[in-house]
From Swiss-Prot:
Enzyme Commission code: 1.17.4.1, 3.1.-.-
Single Gene Ontology MF annotation: endonuclease activity
Gene Ontology biological process terms, A to Z: deoxyribonucleotide biosynthetic process; intein-mediated protein splicing
Keywords from the named record: ATP-binding, Autocatalytic cleavage, Cobalamin, Cobalt, Deoxyribonucleotide synthesis, Disulfide bond, Endonuclease, Hydrolase, Nuclease, Nucleotide-binding, Oxidoreductase, Protein splicing, Repeat
This protein's name: Vitamin B12-dependent ribonucleoside-diphosphate reductase
Binding residue positions for substrate: 257, 272-273, 301, 913-914, 1297-1299, 1471-1475
Residues in ATP-cone domain copies: 4-96
Function: Provides the precursors necessary for DNA synthesis. Catalyzes the biosynthesis of deoxyribonucleotides from the corresponding ribonucleotides.
Enzymatic reactions: a 2'-deoxyribonucleoside 5'-diphosphate + [thioredoxin]-disulfide + H2O = a ribonucleoside 5'-diphosphate + [thioredoxin]-dithiol
């Protein structure tokens, strides 16, 4: 009976497969050169027959079958084959053992066997999870399962049963927040079929639910959804997980590295790369540096090892330094984290908890510690020492964040290098837990303070022994009565009280008592005894109470003190109290015989908390009563917190607190009890003690938890007093804390601390003027060094974590310096964290072509700085790329040629927006400024936000510039009538915007009956009660809404003081400038305003040092001033035209109020109807006053008085004159605006006395249109305000531009498909490519990437937001070279290029197919409608060439137009690095770098052979160790080796076997069909010239490449330049293929001018021998082959030099782990390790 089943080594039973026996025997025959198919058939038949005979239907073990194979081969006389088979078995056994060792497993499973040793080594080194001992605890199966599970989670939430893309549903998000806060409790609780979701899967799932629910798209509640999941209603998606698992474990596709590492794990970040914007201002530069650090490090900073920390382990508390904590768990095993450049201890399996702060709930919580980190920070890193008013000290890295309380009671994070003196930090605070007093620990504390142990010797005959004796002392006999009561009750012992002078004591000899307290107090010399700490807070606080009863005292300062010689105990107690909000400090007190360390508490709130936690349990009644007396008499102290009264008032009012002002005092009323808060409302500073008293009263009245949390928060506050820096090298530490990412730590106290491609073209050039300082700018190269330094700080140990891409555009004035930025990088580390590229535009190529000078432009001014020779610039660029492999080039003109996202990304923009004229005033944080001035200022600052290509009119400008404006924020009720009507005034908030100068357009003036007016374009929209309405559609009688707001203290950019502002207001009202006499005159009513006249004179004398006298003329007083006072007034008012001086619009609110008070006191009055009036001949003045009044929420109306009036005037001679006026204007303030005016501005003297506010009505901010008059054309301006789309202009609410740009901060979400897996063989053994399966896999991978966006945990909120605006994905390829090997197609052939085009066309077509289907079900990406996709355009060059289509693109485009797309971009070809190693295939779209090279493993050295090449060698009987060595010595190439057949030499080509021209054609062929770019290296041999590089650039651009990275072999070398007398000759020098030659000739025919720059004949036919500059050392005997790490030994190079070169020339991972220097090779434009897969770009 035939055998049907076989037992594998892992115990699995699998079907018997005869083909596997055939393949094993065939390989053995090939090994010895036998290619006899007939003999093969005979042997296999006999083997199978023998198996059936011996086992007769039973199940043999695989080893039994292999034994039979050996015997049958020998029976057949094939002894050499049998030997080869035995060696094969042995080698397979060795491989299995090596795999077990790598994976830390006893047995391999089927998944493990699919991966090579090399793949498993890469997985083990970077991807698989490890335990506390550094052992691998995750198998490849488990890794790919967690990745697959996460990938399918979005499918559940997009299921039509729970999701509606058009829905408008409302769900309870509080339940969602509950699940997010408690996600740890749901670890492995839910399943999708057989697959359990871990807690991180669960958290990402709930987070996605929240996101979709916030958009109204979830049809069911979170509880209903989870119930469905629990019932198995989503189990159908198990097959999706199975499929992704199959695709990955069969190495058909691989996600990028971050996804493999972080899926289903705490970090959760799945993206490979990010775009960080950088603008031409210091804030943006520093923000870019910060964001680079955040992305590369994904955490905060680190703190000094001396900082103390309290943590809990297994319910036991510990108080140690950070350094001691690290050492405590070091036995669990350290690991080096090459991703983030640090040493760490994984304690995720150990229940360690620290005190963390939850900024949302404002309370102390327990934070789970997962990892303890250690960093070495050298001299190059500036460390910051932060010291608070309470003496708390933290020495930290510059990027370490702290929690800061703003004056508005908001909690923000600030890095150490952003902190300033006066900032309010959040420190230790009460945790709100109850506390139980335990006498046993009190007694231990008392013994520690006033007890001693000694050895007592018994001399009683027959009972001689030594035992421990405990003696306790105190001056109070009552203490011993209490102690004896406890001892008798607990131990059954009571001791007689003895006395020595004035001190009482007891002797305790009972072993059970002494041993008990000896054990409790063990370790006290090092701080609070561990046995007591372990028992938690109840034990520790009781212990401290005992200490205080023994050694503490209450002082009259007032305060409490505890002094001891045990420094570490005092330090521990200090830190412990601080952790609970008791702000204790330490001081040293000298004694004759040493030092006492004194802990003292003085702060009122801390004394209160000390009493509640400790003091009330003091057993010394005298101390307790004295402490109570101190508290009752405490005046609170004068320590003030700079907090905003109005913000607190708004919060406290919700809890029933009323506030009144009594003169200068602020009064809070709680249940009719009045509590003084000092002068808070006027000084915006409040005593901490006063605030704590008030909050305690409020909590007593309300018992509200939120009030309690606010009280605890205030108690925990400390203020930064000093900040110093040091560059001394230090070892720093940090923790990874789940959820809260912070912990409580510090020296001498405790505060909460957080754990832990760039385009420089917008930066102004070096030496340019900096507007804010008139200093000189540093230039982009300088700031590139800054970002580089940030990356070096992150690197910290010499091992690079990642690299930055720096781009400078060719028109920038610093372009020459940028090109040469790495010129000094010869054996050094200059800018080693940067790959740099030059961005080139069309105009440069035109200038090069025509031989014209090329202008370099200042990005700030737009002006030409100088003109350069483009040919010289081009040659410099090519030379540096030849010499240093940097910079690369980016062809921006090619990139933008098919950019369908231009409109959506904010540029180009059509500027057809509604606008206002230049003198329209816009509310900004700097003041109430004119639109034309805002544009000029913004342009000078140079921060461009967008560019318009259409709609800019005559005299307009295409660029928009960044500004900030103010908009009304939340409203608060200022007044409520008896009828229930309310008046609400808003607080303005600052929002980002950008301003346009649009040019000349037709405008109209809108006038209202109240006097307000605005001039704007006819399509400009104003807010009305019915909504937005265009100016051109307004008519007489229409209503317009005005915003009602009051500016805050931060408003305004200039200050003159309130007194001078009042003087200026009076002068505008009743003043005159005599420019001939150089004198300014002020006028006053002699009877009623003499006091004001004296005051104004005194103010001017005080400020300007002038002499001024008052002159009385009848009922008038005149004050004339000269000198500095005159010049000051003349400079401000300019002339006697009655207008508001421009400076007033920039003043601080109090100064504007003082100005208006002066103006109204001079020219205003209060009428009989109690209306406040201001009269003037100048209507313009009153209009301007209207605008100023609106800054305080005050409405007004202007009346025209056309009737004649008389003015009486008395001359200096006493003559009375009468002046008649034909008319004047009067501004009138009525209703509730009068009340606001009285409160905010007021009048001086008798006018204020006349003002009665008894009857006030609420007035509504609504005005009535009087007329709309078309004026003609004027220059107009507009503002784009993202998200808000409005701004305040002349008091009106105006609608802004409609375009909203896509900000930068996008991310790359990548995966690569292994092309080699789709090469199949027909029945004749002929290879073919399975296009159908390929199409299927492309769509699956596109879905995987689309899903990954939804479950990604992005490092910055900007990245999260902007990634989801476009949902850009990057389906890519790898294994191209291996696929071509299998198909027998040369890489550098017309057939090869054709295959590249087709395979990429399929990639993009079917990625789009998925995206269309996803759009139908899930919706389009948010910016879809703003792109050119709806117009039928695609960002794919091949689409515009129908003659080369293989697929129906026209039909696809129609589907896109009908249904839209889910993803803005879908394909790219990134570097694949280690991911291709995991997939056991060739890297990305590159040719292989070497077919054979030597490699070391634990069992020895062996030759690594490309698997496809190896199979072919064996198939042809060519395989041998001798041949492998020969190929390895031939630079890994088979070219020119007579042992290798010609057809194999043609197919099996390496990177350096291929001419650079063919490399470019390969890149262009692939680029043609990608939506994004292709990463590929243009390899050149060492002998290549600068002319070759120039030619490569020109040809690459003409062929449509989006960028080029040239790597000349050897240009990464660290050796100095040398001229080689005899040039080393490779055996083989590549020549361009015939197809490449044809393409080159076609380009030259089309663009003949390029012959001026390249030598076409030399490219086609090779060049003559000549001496060349080389980066190879002069004494080098042979070129190194990548991967042959034995070529360079660490001992040959100084250690410090090695450290500099890691990540630049040598692999950092191989050196750190194995001490080997492995040279990096260029692959896909990135320096990559050929051994472990480490990549400089960290893309995959």
């Amino acid at each position: 009976m035939a055998v049907e089943k076989v037992m594998k080594r892992d115990g699995r039973i699998v079907p018997f497969d005869e083909s596997r026996i055939r393949w094993a025997v065939q390989r053995a025959m090939w090994e010895v050169g036998i290619r006899d198919e007939k003999k093969l058939d005979e042997v296999v038949k006999s083997i199978v027959q023998r198996i059936n005979e011996l086992y007769d239907g039973k199940i043999p073990h695989i080893e039994n079958i292999q034994d039979i194979v050996e015997l049958e081969l020998m029976r057949a006389g094939l002894f050499e084959v049998a030997k080869a088979y035995i060696l094969y078995r042995k080698k397979k056994a060795e491989i299995r053992e090596e795999k077990k060792r790598i994976l830390n497993k006893k047995e391999l499973d089927e998944i493990d066997k699919r991966f090579s040793i090399n793949a498993l080594r890469v997985l083990a080194s970077r991807y698989l999870k490890k335990d506390e001992n550094g052992n691998i605890v995750e198998s490849p199966r488990e890794l790919f399962e967690r990745v697959a599970i996460l990938a399918v989670i979005p499918d559940l939430l997009y299921d039509e049963r729970v999701f509606d893309k058009n829905g408008n549903y409302s769900q309870d998000l509080k339940r969602v927040e509950y699940y997010l806060e408690h996600f740890e409790e749901f670890d492995r609780k839910y399943s999708i079929g057989k697959y359990k979701l871990n807690k991180y899967h669960f958290e990402r799932m709930v987070n996605l639910y929240k996101e979709l629910a916030e958009q109204g798209k979830m049809k069911v509640s979170i509880d209903e959804f989870l119930a469905m999941l629990e019932k198995g209603e989503f189990n159908e998606y198990e097959k999706e997980i199975n499929e992704y698992f199959r695709l990955m474990t069969n190495q058909i596709f691989m996600p990028n590295t971050p996804a493999l590492i972080n899926s289903g794990r705490p970090l959760g970040m799945l993206s490979a790369c990010f775009v960080v914007p950088i603008e031409d201002d210091m804030e943006s530069i520093m923000k870019a540096a910060h964001d680079v650090a955040m992305i590369q490090k994904m955490g905060g900073g680190c703190i000094d090892g001396k900082a103390k920390i309290i943590f809990e382990n297994e319910g036991e508390e510990h108080l140690t330094t950070m350094e001691e904590m690290y050492e405590r768990y070091k036995h669990l095993g350290e690991f080096y984290d090459e991703e983030y450049n640090r040493w760490g201890i994984d304690v995720s399996n150990v229940p360690i908890y620290v005190k963390s702060f939850d900024p949302e709930s404002k309370r102390v919580v327990k934070g789970k510690v997962n990892v303890i980190w250690k960093y070495e920070l050298g001299k190059d890193v500036t460390k910051y020492e932060i010291i608070t008013n309470k003496g708390t000290k933290i020495l930290t890295s510059p990027w370490h964040p702290f929690f800061v309380l703003t004056p508005d009671f908001k909690i923000v994070e600030k890095r150490a290098d952003e902190l300033k003196e006066g900032d309010i930090l959040i420190g230790g605070m009460p945790d709100g837990e109850d506390y139980k007093f335990i006498f046993d620990y009190w007694l231990a504390g008392f013994i520690a303070g006033d007890g001693c142990f000694d050895k007592y010797h018994s001399h009683v005959k027959g009972h001689e022994y030594i035992y421990d004796r405990l003696r306790i002392y105190d001056y109070r006999i009552e203490t011993f009565e209490i102690i004896n009561d406890y001892l008798e009750k607990t131990f059954g012992r009571k001791y007689s009280i003895q006395k020595d002078r004035n001190i009482y004591y007891i002797d305790i000899k009972a072993r059970n008592i002494t041993s008990h307290y000896l054990k409790l107090l063990e370790g006290i010399d090092n701080g609070i005894p561990p046995q007591i700490l372990k028992e938690g807070k109840n034990a520790v606080l009781s212990f401290i109470a005992g200490l205080f009863d023994a050694e503490g005292h209450v002082s009259n300062k007032p305060g409490i003190e505890l002094g001891m010689v045990n420094k570490r105990l005092i330090e521990d107690v200090t830190h412990y109290l601080n952790a609970l909000g008791i702000k204790a400090r330490i001081r040293e007190k000298l004694r004759k015989d040493g030092i006492d360390y004194v802990l003292h508490v003085e702060e009122y709130s801390s004394l209160l908390r000390f009493y509640e936690l400790i003091g009330k349990n003091l057993q010394n009644e005298e101390k307790r009563e004295k402490l109570e007396k101190v508290l009752s008499n405490h005046k609170g102290g004068n320590f003030g917190l700079p907090l905003n009264f109005n913000a607190f008032k708004e919060w406290a009012s919700e809890y029933g607190v009323e506030f009144k002002t009594n003169g200068s005092q602020t009064i809070a009323i709680i249940n009719d009890e009045r509590i003084s808060l000092g002068q808070w409302h006027t000084r915006n500073r409040v005593s901490k003690a006063v605030l704590v008293k008030m909050l305690r009263k409020l909590y007593e009245a309300t018992k509200d938890e939120e009030v309690k949390r606010m009280l605890h928060l205030i108690e925990g506050l400390e203020v930064v007093r000093h900040i110093t820096t040091t560059n001394e090298p230090r070892t720093f530490y940090d923790l990874t804390v789940e959820n809260y990412q912070n912990y409580l730590a510090g020296e001498n106290g405790m505060i909460f601390v957080h754990n832990t491609g760039l385009n420089f073209s917008k930066l102004r050039p070096e030496g340019d003027i900096v507007g804010t300082t008139t200093g000189a700018a540093s230039g982009p190269v300088s700031f590139m060094h800054l970002i580089d330094a940030v990356s070096d700080v992150i690197k910290q140990g010499g091992v690079r974590r990642g690299a930055n891409m720096g781009i400078l555009e060719i028109w920038h004035p610093d372009i020459e310096k940028f090109i040469h930025a790495k010129e000094k990088n010869i054996g050094t580390n200059v800018l080693s964290n940067f790959n740099i590229s030059v961005g080139i535009w069309e105009d440069f190529w035109e200038a090069l072509k025509e031989g014209k000078k090329y202008p370099l432009i200042n990005p700030r001014t737009g002006e030409v700085v100088k003109e350069v020779d483009p040919k010289t610039l081009f040659e410099e660029l090519a030379y540096m790329a030849w010499a240093k492999a940097d910079p690369g080039v980016i062809f921006f003109d090619v990139i933008n040629r098919r950019n369908v996202l231009k409109k959506a990304k904010g540029g180009p923009i059509r500027a057809t927006n509604p606008c206002v004229v230049g003198d329209t005033r816009i509310l900004t944080p700097e003041g109430y400024l004119k639109a034309e001035e805002i544009f000029s200022l913004a342009k000078e600052r140079g921060k461009k936000e967008a560019v318009a290509v259409e709609g800019i009119a005559e005299e307009g400008e295409p660029y928009a510039y960044s500004v900030e404006i103010l908009l009304p924020g939340e409203e608060k009720v200022e007044y409520e009538t008896v009828h229930g009507k309310v008046l609400a005034v808003a607080d303005p908030v600052a929002v980002p915007a950008y301003v346009w100068k649009v040019g000349r357009k037709k405008v109209a003036r809108v006038k209202t009956k109240e006097g307000y007016e605005i001039t704007a374009t006819l399509d400009h929209k104003l807010m009305t009660p019915e909504g937005w309405k265009e100016v051109g559609k307004l008519k007489e009688g229409d209503k317009i809404l005005l915003p009602r707001f009051e500016v805050e203290e931060e408003f305004g950019s200039e200050s003159i003081g309130e007194d001078l502002a009042f003087v200026l207001g009076w002068f505008i009202g009743d003043g005159y400038l005599n420019v001939n006499d150089k004198r300014a005159w002020f006028y006053f009513n002699a009877e009623k305003e003499e006091e004001i006249a004296v005051r104004i004179r005194d103010i001017l004398v005080k400020h300007f040092g002038i002499k001024a006298e008052l002159h009385r003329y009848g009922n008038q007083i005149k004050l004339g001033v000269r000198g500095e006072a005159y010049r000051w007034l003349e400079n401000i008012v300019k002339n006697n035209e009655k207008r508001i001086p421009e400076i007033v619009y920039r003043l601080k609110p109090r100064e504007i109020a003082a100005f208006l008070r002066g103006l109204f006191s001079a020219d205003g009055y209060v009428d009989k109807d109690m209306a406040i009036r201001l009269t003037s001949k100048s209507r313009e003045l009153l209009r301007e006053v209207q605008d100023l009044l609106l800054l305080f929420g005050i409405l007004s109306k202007i009346y025209e008085k056309p009737y004649e009036s008389e003015f009486h005037y008395t001359t200096k001679n006493g003559e009375e004159r009468i002046y008649r006026s034909k008319g004047y204007y009067e501004l009138v303030i009525t209703n509730y605006s009068r009340k606001l005016f009285a409160e905010k501005i007021g009048l001086e003297g008798y006018k204020m006395e006349k003002l009665s506010l008894k009857k006030t009505k609420v007035d509504q901010p609504i005005v009535t249109v009087e007329s709309v008059e078309v004026l003609g054309e004027e220059i107009v301006y507009d503002f784009t305000v993202p998200n808000y789309h409005m701004y305040i202009s002349n008091g009106f609410m105006s609608h802004n531009c409609g375009e909203e740009p896509l900000y930068e901060y996008e991310s790359c979400n990548l995966a690569s498909i292994n092309l080699a897996k789709f090469v199949k063989y027909d029945e004749n053994g002929k290879p073919y490519f399975d296009w159908d399966e390929y199409a299927y896999v492309i769509q699956k991978v596109a879905k995987y990437l689309d899903n990954s966006i939804d479950v990604n945990k992005f490092p910055l909120p900007e990245i999260d937001y902007n990634t989801k605006l476009t949902r850009r994905i990057g389906v890519g390829m790898m294994g191209l070279a291996d696929a071509l090997f299998k198909l027998g197609i040369p890489y550098n052939s017309e057939e090869g290029f054709k295959f590249m085009r087709k395979v990429t066309e399929y990639l993009t077509f079917y990625a789009y197919k998925y995206s269309v289907e996803a759009a139908k079900k899930r919706g389009t990406f948010p910016l879809y409608d703003k792109t050119e996709y709806p117009e039928g355009k695609l960002p794919v060059e091949g689409f515009y060439h129908p003659e080369i289509w293989n697929l129906p693109w026209d039909k696809l485009v129609e589907e896109i137009k009908k249904y839209g797309l889910r993803n803005a971009m879908v394909t790219t070809c990134p570097p694949t690095g280690s991911v291709s190693m995991i997939a056991d295939t060739s890297s990305g779209i590159e040719p292989v770098y070497a077919l054979v090279y030597k490699k070391s493993v634990t069992v020895g050295e062996f030759y690594y052979v490309d698997p496809v090449f190896e199979e072919e060698l064996k198939k042809r009987g060519l395989y041998s160790e001798e041949l492998l060595k020969k190929i390895s010595d031939n630079y890994g190439s088979v070219q020119g080796l007579e042992e290798i057949p010609e057809d194999m030499q043609r197919v099996f080509v390496t990177a350096l076997d291929i001419h650079w021209l063919d490399h470019i054609i390969a890149q262009a062929s692939i680029q043609m069909w990608l939506t994004d770019s292709a990463s590929k290296t243009i390899n050149m041999i060492n002998e290549a010239t600068v002319e070759d590089v120039k030619a490569a650039y020109l040809i690459a651009r003409f062929l449509g490449c989006k960028g080029v990275t040239v790597y000349r072999d050897g240009s990464l070398s660290v050796q100095v330049y040398s001229v080689e007398g005899e040039k080393k000759k490779r055996r083989f020098k590549p020549k361009p293929s015939e197809y490449a030659k044809k393409i080159l000739l076609e380009i030259v025919e089309k663009e003949p001018w390029i012959k001026n720059f390249i030598n076409v004949d030399e490219i086609l036919n090779g060049k003559k021998e000549q001496l060349l500059f080389s980066l190879r050392p002069a004494n080098e005997s042979k070129l190194k082959v990548p991967g042959r790490e034995e070529e360079v030994r660490p001992g040959n190079i100084p250690e410090e030099k090695i450290r500099e070169l890691l990540g630049v020339v040598y692999c950092p991972v191989c050196y750190e782990k194995e001490g080997k220097l492995v040279e990096l090779k260029m692959e896909s434009g990135c320096a990559t390790c050929p051994v472990c897969g480490w990549s400089k770009c960290v893309i995959s």
